[in-house]
Amino acid sequence: MSQSSTRKRLIQWSPHNKSSFIVGSNDLRLYNFKFKDKNEKKNENNINNSNQYNQNNQQQQQQQIQQQQQQQQQQQQQQQQQQQQQQQQQQQQHDIYSPKSITSKYMETYNFDIEYPPDDWVPQEKKTISLMSVNSDVQLMKCMAWCPDESDTNLIACGLTSGRAILTSFSSVNRILKELVPKHTRSCNAISWNPIYTNQLAVGLDKVRGDSSTLIWDINYLQSTTLNNHLHKNNNNYISKLQQQQNNIDQPYIISQISDNSFSTSTDYTDTIYQPISEFTQSEATLALAWLPNNPSCLLVGTGSKWLKLYDIRDVNSSQSVMAHQKSVNGVCVDPFDFNRIATMSEDSHIKVWDLRNLDDPLIIVNSNCKSIQQIDWCPTRSGVLASVGKDKSSIKLWDIKAPIEFSKSPKLESTTLSTGGGGSGSNTSNNLNKRSTSNNNNSQDPINTISKPTKIHHSSDVVSSFSWHPTNECRMLTVSYSGVIDVVSLNENIPISWSPHGGICFSFGNNVLEGPTKGETLEPNILNYKNLINDGRYEKDISSKIKERAIFGYSANVEENINLANKINDENINFLWKWIQKVPIQIQNFKRESSLISTPSISTTTPGGPITPSATTKTIINNNNNNNNNKNINNNINNINNNNNNNNNNNNNNNNNNNNNNNNNNNNNEYNGIYNILIEKDISTVESSNGFVIYKSPNRNLCLSICGWGFNQSLPLENILSRLEKSGEYERAAAIAVFHLDIKRAILVVTNATYNIHPVTQTNHHGHLMRQDREFSLKLLSIALAGFDGSSTSNNNNNNNNNNNNIWKETCKSTAKSFINPYLKTCLEFLASNSDSKDIYSIIEDSRINLDDKIAFSCKYLDYQDLIHFVERNTIRVIECGNLKGVLLTGLTGRGVDLLSNYIDRTCDIQTAVLAISLVVPKFFRDKRVSKWSSIYSDLLDQWELWHERAILDIQTRISGIDQPPTPQIFAKCGFCQNSFAFESISASSIVGRNASSKPNFKAKVPFCPHCKQSLPRCCLCLLPLNCMVPTPEFKKSNTTIGSGGGSIASSGGINNSGSINNPNDSQLWSNGSEPFEDWFTWCQTCRHGGHSQHILDWFKDHSICPVTSCDCRCSQL
C-alpha cells in the first residue's frame, strides 16, 4: 500500500468519449464520469425495489402451483372438480399477483409531472464516477497515450519501465494486443501517437551506448482493427457489479476504495514488433516527444542534454536543434490553436514559449516560482492558456500568454543556441554548437518578455501527480494525487467586462456573451435628503457619459453657446475657461488700440489707469532699460524653464522646438495670450504710495488686472463688483478685495452687512448652526481689526509711541490671522500687518489659498517687476503640472497652454473641452501634433456615438478657425518641350504679352504657344484650332504693382515681384483673373493622348463613343 501511494499516477481524458478517462500506475483503469441528479437516483432505487418485489411474487406463485399439482395427484377421483377449482384459483392468483398489477399498484404512487421549483430551489445534480474496467496486465507503467484514431476508441499505448511499449484495449479478449520491443532494456520516458498517421507511434527511451533513444514504430494498425470485434463475453456480470460501485465525488474520489478484483486473460498469443521504422537521437536520453499536427512528418524531441530537436522522419540526417534550457528538456507540447507555438519545461522553474519559425530566442519565459516543474499542457479549448504543476506541489497554475497583462522586460537567463545539421550529437557537432552558442551569446543582448504572475491558481488537498484537460469543456480538469485521489476541478476564468461607447455593459462567461440593459431609467433616492451631506456616497457619471451629454446639449467651439450652457455643464473650471475665452480677445484688442493711439513718453508722471492723487508719492520706472541686466537674467531663466517643461511634456514630439518658435513668433497676433506673455513684454511702470503701501502701475499690469477682473474704472467702479459679491453671499471675498484696494471703510461696511444677512440662516441642523456662528464670529473679529488700522502705520515719520502701538496691532493681527479658516480673511490681516515690502507681500501671497485670479491681480498691484515675474513663473509651472483649467489665465491658449491641457486630459480624460478650446488657435496661430491627435480621437468618439450632426459642426468650426489654404493641384498642364507649367501664377514677367494688348485694360490674354519656350501648342482634334494658354498682360502688372522711392517694383497682393514671378499665388482674386472658361480647358484621353477643347469633346461624345481622330479606335468615353 505504501509503495502504490508514492508511485506516480497518470490520468488522461478520452479524446473520443467526453465522459471517459483512464488512470494508470500499477494497472490501467477505465472510468466513466457523468452528472446525476437526486430524483433520478431515487427513481432508480424505487424501480429496483419494485422489480425485486415482482420476483418474490413470482416465486410464491410457483410454490402454489406445485402444491396444487400435489393435490391433483391425491384427489384423482375428483379431478374434474379439482381442475375446475384449480383453474378458478389460478385465474384469481393471476389477477392478484401478475407483474402488471404489481407494477401498477406500486408505481401509481410516483408522480413524474414537472413542477415549477420554488424560489429557494437548489439544484440537486451530483457528479458521479463509475469504474468501467480494470486491466491488470499493464504493470510498472511510466507513460501512456490514447490513440487519436476514431475507428478504435479504446486503443491505448503504454510505455513501461522495461522500455517496452504495449498496445492495450478495454474492449478486446486479449488485453495486450501488441508489444514493441527495443534492442536494449531501458526505461520508456515518453510516448506519442502521430495525430495524422495513426499507425505511427513515437517512443522516447533512456540513453544507451550505440543505440538511439527515439524510435518510430509502425504498429500495422490496419491488421489490428479486427480486434474490436472480439468482445469479452464472459465478464458481463463482473462489469455490471462494477457499475453499481458509484461514489459521489463532491469529495475527491479515492481509488483505494475500489476493490482490487481485477482480471487477466492474457493467455492468447500477443504480436511482437522488434524493428522500428526510424531511429533518432543517439547517445542522448529522450525525455519528451510531440508531433506537429500541421506537419505529421516532423517530431519534436526533448533530450536530457538541454537540447530541443526537430526531426523529419523522412530524412534522418536533417534536423534542427536549439539549446532550450540549462538542464534537460523534460516536457514539450504544441499549442492546439497555433501549431507554430510550443512550450517546453525543464527541471528548473522556467517554462519557455517558442515560435518554430524562429528558434533563436523564446517568445516568452514563464517563471513558475517553484524549484522544478512536473507537467505542462496547453488548454484544448482556450487559446493561449497553459497549465503547469510543480514537483511535489498541490497547486495548478494557469498562464494566459495572450491576456492584457504587464510583461516585465528582463535580460536573457541563458544562452540560446540554434543548430542545423545531422541527427547525431557527436563530439564534432557539440564543438560546433558550442562555438555557435558563444557567438550568439555575445551578439544577442535583447531582453525577453517574462511572466511571473499566473492568471489563476487551483489549490488541491493533496500533492498533484498528474492532470488532464477536458477535451471540450473549457472549465473542467481532472487531477490525480500520489495517494490515488481523483478530483474534478472547475477552473472558471475571470469574467471580462467591457463598456460600450453607448454606455452599455457586456461581459462573457465561457462561450456565452451576456449584454446588460442599455435602456431604462436609473432609480435614485431623493437628492434633497442628502443636500446637507458633503458626500452623498454616489459616484459621479463616467466622463464618457458627460462628454456625450454635453455634445448633445450643443457643447461646441461656439463661445457664446458654451457660456449659455454653464448650468448644464455644471463645472466651475470649464465655465471659467469659456468666460476667459470670451473676454480676453476684446480686452487685448482694446489695449492694443489704446496703445496705438497714445504715444509712449520717455518719462511720465501719470498712469494709464488715471491720474495720481496729489497726496501720493510717484516715481517712474522704465522696465527692461534701467534694470536691463537683471531682467535679462530673469528672461533667460524663464526661457530655460519653458524649454525644460516643453521637453518633458513632449518627449515623443520631434518638432517641439519648431512649434515653440512658431508660437513665440505668433504671440503678438494671438488674441488669447496669457498673463505670463503679457508681463514679460517691455513696459513702463509707475510707483505710487498710498496708505503706506507701494502700488505698481503700468499698461501691462492694468491689462492683467482687467483680465483678472480687477480692471476698475469709471464705467466699471469697484462698488459694482463689491455689490455683486455681497448679493451672491461672498462677503469674505468682497471684504478682502476692498482691503486690497485700501478701501477700509467699504470693507467694514461689507462685514457689517454680512453679520445682518447671514443671521436668518435657513439651515436648521446643528452642524449648519455651528458653521454660521463660526463665520459670524470671524467677520466680527475682522471688523475689529480693520477698525484699528492706521494708514500711516507704515510711514517712517511716525513717532516712537505710534510705532509701538502699530507694532502691537500688527502682531495681534498676525496671530489672529492664523485662527481664520477662510483664506480671504487670513490674507486680509496678513496683508495689513505686513511691512509693505515686496518681499514680505510675496511670502504672504505665495502661501495664500485664495482664487488664482485674485492672487495674480494682487501680485500685479503690489509686487515689483522681478518678484512679479518670479511669482507668475512659479504659478505658471504649478498650474501646468496640475492641469488646472484656471491656469489658462497665465498660460493662455499658447504652447504652454497646450501643455496645461495635456495634463488636464491626463487628469480628467475630458478630451472634449481641450479640443474645443484649443481649436480656436490651432492651426490658426501655431501647430502642435498633440492637438491633431486629440481632434482625431474626439471625432472618432462622436462617430462611435453616431452623433453625425455634432461631428459635422465640429469639422465646420475647426475649418473656419484654421488657416485658409487652397488644396494643392492634382493635375498639371505643362509644355511637352520645356516641361514648364501653364499655371497662371508660374508665368514670369518676361512672358507678359504686350504687342497685342488693346486699349481696354485687361488682366489676361490668350496665346497659342507656350509662354516659356514659345513652341506652338497642340490643335483641337475637332475644330483644328490651336489650344490657348492664359498669360498676364502689362495692364495686370501696372494695376498690381507699386513703385517705391528707390525705383524698385514692390508687388502687392497678386502682383509681380522684382524676380519676375507673381506674388501671393493663394490670392482668390489672382486665381479668378488667371482662370479660363471651362469650354476652353485642355481635355485629353489618358490612353490615346488625343484631345481638344472641353466643350468640343463633350459635344462629340454625346453621340459617339470612339475617338474623333481618324484611324483611332480608342473608346475614350468608356474608360
Curated annotation (Swiss-Prot):
Gene expressing this chain: mios
SUPFAM superfamilies to which the protein is assigned, alphabetical: WD40 repeat-like
Subunit structure: Probably part of the GATOR complex.
Binding-site list for Zn(2+) 2: C1023, H1093, H1096
Subcellular locations according to the entry: Lysosome membrane
Sequence similarity: Belongs to the WD repeat mio family.
Main location: membrane
The species this protein was found in: Dictyostelium discoideum
Residues at which Zn(2+) 1 binds: C975, C978, C1010, C1013
Protein name: GATOR2 complex protein MIOS
